[in-house]
């Protein structure tokens, strides 16, 4: 969770969206104040967001090492349950810290929601994994035209409460294969939105802040 202190009453203001807001209303004194000095707070650990970003590569490396150690522990019957639980909590804390370092809040989908991806003049149906005003993660089976990193694609989506479909130009940042044993080849694709227009930004921000995932009626346009 992201936190900042109200300059008026000194109370703690919490919001997962602080990194995208220039001002926020304090729940204690009801004053609208400027967002400054944002902290990332996890269970038992708090760090200034700027300090975290300055050391982000170290925390990413630490997470990889802890996850590797946890994997080895899973195959070691001499490791106590308490130790395993502690490492699980440590991994969770590091994940929360890295999530707080992001420039945009990511809304993770809790149901299967599909979009249309236009890539190199081909249209494909893809599943939305998470989304922010900065980009998204999508999932699809192996395609003849599977986009590569740096490729430009267009995502077509229809959001609840908005009559017109949104068309978002995006650049592929990474592509990862998810399955090894299964017959179906599943891939996850991370994209960054390019020149998102004001209407699209407003629509996505509304979806994210309202958290209306369960009642959403996403569909491919």
Predicted regions and their residues:
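Short coil-to-beta transition motif at edge beta-strands of beta-rich domains
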Residues: 109-114, 146-158
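N-terminal helix initiation/capping motif
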Residues: 1-141, 206-221
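Small-residue-enriched segments and motifs
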Residues: 113, 126, 170-173, 191
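Short, solvent-exposed secondary-structure boundary/capping segments
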Residues: 137-140, 178-192
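Well-ordered alpha/beta subsegment
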Residues: 195, 201-208
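Short, conserved beta-turn/loop elements at beta-strand boundaries and strand-helix junctions
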Residues: 118, 133, 175-181
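Short coil-to-beta-strand transition motifs
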Residues: 107-108, 121-123, 159-169
